[in-house]
Amino acid sequence: MRFQPWTSALRFVLAGSLLLTVSVASAGPKEDVRAATMKWGQTLGQNDPDKVVLLYAADGVLWGTLSPTVRADRAALRDYFVTAFKVLPGLKVTFGEQLIRVYGGTAVNTGYYTFGYVKDGETKTLPARYSFTFVKDGENWMIVDHHSSAMPAPPR
């Protein structure tokens, strides 16, 4: 069989198209996890503990910023958010850098966020760091593990 220059070009274009398709397809789950994280932030801003709890898997766990206790079921999660919304009225969250890794049906999002709330008529902030672990459940990414802690003061 005689080598044709156009077959080389065609192979190059097809290989490039395949690589592009793979990279675009692999970007999807990260964006889905980012969207699930943003949904958590938007839902938190509604200050409705029942809605926030629905974003966690039935066996979801929370080690929250405001509590020394791990919350390991939906009733305990709800209790945490009821308290958080009382202690931090008008609670909102703004996300900083997010480092998202996807491992099949599991994903981890690690980063920092800043909580904003109103106290004595004044807006206050609480910078914190977080890790969310998500598991894919059908079309939804559910939170199975969430750790959040106040950002430590810089060393002196």
Tell where the protein language model's regions lie, with residue ranges.
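N-terminal secretory signal peptides that target proteins for export/translocation
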Residues: M1-S8
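Bacterial N-terminal signal peptides
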Residues: R11-T21
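Sec/Tat signal peptide C-region and signal peptidase I cleavage site
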Residues: S23-A27
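A beta-strand edge to alpha-helix "cap/lid" segment located at domain peripheries
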Residues: G28-K51, V61-R156
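Helix-to-beta-strand junctions that scaffold the AdoMet/dcAdoMet cofactor pocket
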Residues: A57
